[in-house]
Amino acid sequence: MKLHYVAVLTLAILMFLTWLPESLSCNKALCASDVSKCLIQELCQCRPGEGNCSCCKECMLCLGALWDECCDCVGMCNPRNYSDTPPTSKSTVEELHEPIPSLFRALTEGDTQLNWNIVSFPVAEELSHHENLVSFLETVNQPHHQNVSVPSNNVHAPYSSDKEHMCTVVYFDDCMSIHQCKISCESMGASKYRWFHNACCECIGPECIDYGSKTVKCMNCMF
């Protein structure tokens, strides 16, 4: 009976998220999994807008770092108009502390039949772009998000203007969670990763000075 109840509730949650209008809804790609978990555990059932905030603290703890992005999915805060700031215009970035440059280069040389897209462009082009995405740096020692500012003397890839360096990045074809994105990029030896809030994952190679490309290019995860 309990399994049946959980299945019905999960289906109802997914239908609810699908029904929400695109321009006025929560970030489905980012929030669906965690929202479902919190609702199944009945931690977000109260309605602050109606004066009942008895579950607010438990719901916030359940959503954790996703509270700011996902509180509107569970009716805890006012809905936002995402037509002005689509998920593709935001991303989370992180440096990977044990990159394997030789592995990354080997996996990205030549044509591959794997489910990813390899893109290379001059480092000078990478550095010339202004950071027009809202990016956050997540590290083990810095649990709170902070705006990214990357020094030009990044230890992963020293840059010299007298030689043309190429920045190589890999986009996975399919959408994935931020956790899976980090694991996938670590497994191919990347130096950093960028996870767009539409769930597109970009692994960044050792020659890149900044955080790769700010453009979504995941074949099956563009919106």
Curated annotation (Swiss-Prot):
Annotated glycosylation sites: N52, N81
Pfam families, A to Z: Tsg (PF04668), Tsg_N (PF23782)
Any one biological process term the GO annotation gives: chondrocyte differentiation
Keyword flag DNA-binding: no
Localization: Secreted
Gene Ontology molecular function: any one: transforming growth factor beta binding
GO cellular component, one term: extracellular space
Domain of life: Eukaryota
Chief location: secreted
Signal peptide: 1-25
Residues passing through the membrane, by range: none
Keywords: Developmental protein, Glycoprotein, Secreted, Signal
Function of the molecule: May be involved in dorsoventral axis formation. Seems to antagonize BMP signaling by forming ternary complexes with CHRD and BMPs, thereby preventing BMPs from binding to their receptors. In addition to the anti-BMP function, also has pro-BMP activity, partly mediated by cleavage and degradation of CHRD, which releases BMPs from ternary complexes. May be an important modulator of BMP-regulated cartilage development and chondrocyte differentiation. May play a role in thymocyte development.
UniProt family annotation: Belongs to the twisted gastrulation protein family.
Domain notes: The N-terminal domain is sufficient to interact with BMP4.
Subunit structure, as described in the record: Interacts with CHRD and BMP4. This interaction enhances CHRD/BMP4 complex formation. Interacts with BMP7.
Name of the molecule in the record: Twisted gastrulation protein homolog 1
Organism (species): Homo sapiens (Human)
Gene: TWSG1
